[in-house]
Amino acid sequence: RDRMNKIRLVVASLLLGAATGFAQKPFNASGTGNPIIPGYFADPTVKKFGDTYYMYATTDGSGAGFGPAQVWTSKDFVNWTLMPMNWPDSHWIWAPDVMKHTDGNYYYFYCQPCMIHCGVSETPRGPWKNILGESEAVLVPDRFVTNAITLDGQTFVDDDGSVYLYWGTWGIYKGFGCGAGKLASDMKSFTETRLIPNTEATDFFEAPFVMKRKGIYYFMYSSGSCHDHTYRVQYATSDKPMGPYTYRGCILETNTDGTIHGPGHHSVLKEGNEYYMVYHRHDNPHSNRGFHRQLCVDRMEFAEDGSIKSLIPTHDGIGALASSVVKSKNLALGAKVRASSFYDAGFRPEYAVDDNNGTLWLSLIHI
């Protein structure tokens, strides 16, 4: 009997290890699917317009979202091309989002502390012009909704075509929360606004994202500190887009070995009947205070009652969502590499040719 109990314990441990990602590739393995793209980016919104995926994100650049306006495009969700955008022509472009309206136009929302701007275009990559006329005109000023600090604007389009905008950061204080508004048909004003308080969205910090599935509205958001391992994704549900909402729990957090560190500020891509969460995590090895972030994606799953199952963040990602557009072979993969120096063991020369967007080589002296 003792021997059988030991066998059951071993089998259970193996199953648990598989379920929690115990057997996954390490973060620095060759050919990982996460991060999705090379470089340091954050706050991703991924949309599919026609047969093309568009990924809009904060560009960390030298750190903490300093970069300009740009967009990544892909036909297969594996091979991406970086494209600049004309507007705005400044830096510090945070948490961008683009949506297609029933009027056929595309609307581009981006943030600068602490305000939200909106541009309009006939294509999802511009050229953009401010919907209010002047280039720096502000759609949502700070505290437009009382006790909602204006940042991280994100749109949701309901089944009837109604457009909602959600925003907020530092919503942890008593009486604070997330701003929400129903946009007028001209997209220049609001017909209804509300504060979604942190009593409904427990520990709401920032980065709201709303989606609808089978009649349930899911209000997802990030909690904790964006600088450390406490950053995570939680959610609440309602039968109305503006709430009131009921808190449901945490669905994405730092993994057990810390190599997926501080995952959060996400969006959701729906592809057929499948849902994918696209989010950022801190770089590996972790830099100071999480100012260099990387974009990842993992599959979402739902229980029979509509609740979101806890995501198991991976280094594998999801792979291609369409036939690959790149037919040529990666000739550099696995090649022997030498360098005059390297910074430390976390930045070895072979990382330059390992087909892993999360690793890189740095010389001992680098800028």
Feature locations, PLM:
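Aromatic-lined glycan-binding groove of carbohydrate-active enzymes
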Residues: 209
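Bacterial N-terminal signal peptides
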Residues: 10-18
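Disordered, acidic Ser/Thr/Pro-rich linker "stalks" and the adjacent N-terminal cap
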Residues: 319-365
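Bacterial N-terminal signal peptides that target proteins for export
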Residues: 2-11
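Beta-rich carbohydrate-recognition and catalytic domains
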Residues: 24-202, 212-258, 273-275, 280-325
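Signature of short aromatic-glycine-proline-rich micro-motifs recurring in repeat-based ectodomains
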Residues: 264-267
